[in-house]
Amino acid sequence: MANSERTFIAIKPDGVQRGLMGEIIKRFEQKGFRLVAMKFMRASEDLLKEHYIDLKDRPFFAGLVKYMHSGPVVAMVWEGLNVVKTGRVMLGETNPADSKPGTIRGDFCIQVGRNIIHGSDSVESAEKEIALWFRPEELVNYKSCAQNWIYE
């Protein structure tokens, strides 16, 4: 399939604690994207510092790492046509107040510090994040029987 790509999506501790995992996964499945990998884990501080390295000079960096380490996260890799761009649209804006109803953040969030989900912002970021969170053998290649009903 042309333009098929992968993205990294992580349900943050607030999304896990609020029981939104199933709803979020359901939205990606119903859109037609294919789950390639998933881990339910407590991310180490070192992993989180590397993941958010671009934000290391921001005043909220330490609090972000502490918060993300405070509970389990669901780390996932999704695959599909333009999944990075479409996934970001499905998530909504980083600040939930700017997110439209129908998006994950628009439907389930109020404050930016508790915006329940992370999604790669580019194909390059997705590749980096996937390599950081998953070993190559953890990515499962398979053909979904639904693909013929989703893509021409």
UniProtKB/Swiss-Prot annotation:
GO terms for biological process: cell differentiation; CTP biosynthetic process; endocytosis; GTP biosynthetic process; lactation; nervous system development; positive regulation of epithelial cell proliferation; UTP biosynthetic process. Disulfide bonds: none annotated. Major role in the synthesis of nucleoside triphosphates other than ATP. Possesses nucleoside-diphosphate kinase, serine/threonine-specific protein kinase, geranyl and farnesyl pyrophosphate kinase, histidine protein kinase and 3'-5' exonuclease activities. Involved in cell proliferation, differentiation and development, signal transduction, G protein-coupled receptor endocytosis, and gene expression. Required for neural development including neural patterning and cell fate determination. This is Nucleoside diphosphate kinase A 2. The lineage of its organism: Eukaryota, Metazoa, Chordata, Craniata, Vertebrata. Its EC number is 2.7.4.6. Homohexamer. The active site is at residue 118. It catalyses: a 2'-deoxyribonucleoside 5'-diphosphate + ATP = a 2'-deoxyribonucleoside 5'-triphosphate + ADP; a ribonucleoside 5'-diphosphate + ATP = a ribonucleoside 5'-triphosphate + ADP. HAMAP family: NDP_kinase. Its main location: cytoplasm. Autophosphorylation at His-118 increases serine/threonine protein kinase activity of the enzyme. Interaction with the SET complex inhibits exonuclease activity. It holds the Pfam family NDK. PANTHER family: NUCLEOSIDE DIPHOSPHATE KINASE (PTHR11349). The keyword Nucleotide-binding applies. It is found in: Cytoplasm; Cell membrane; Nucleus. One of its GO terms (cellular component) is early endosome. Keywords: ATP-binding, Cell membrane, Cytoplasm, Differentiation, Endocytosis, Kinase, Magnesium, Membrane, Metal-binding, Neurogenesis, Nucleotide metabolism, Nucleotide-binding, Nucleus, Transferase. It is an enzyme of class 2 (transferase). The N-terminus is blocked. Belongs to the NDK family. It comes from Bos taurus (Bovine).
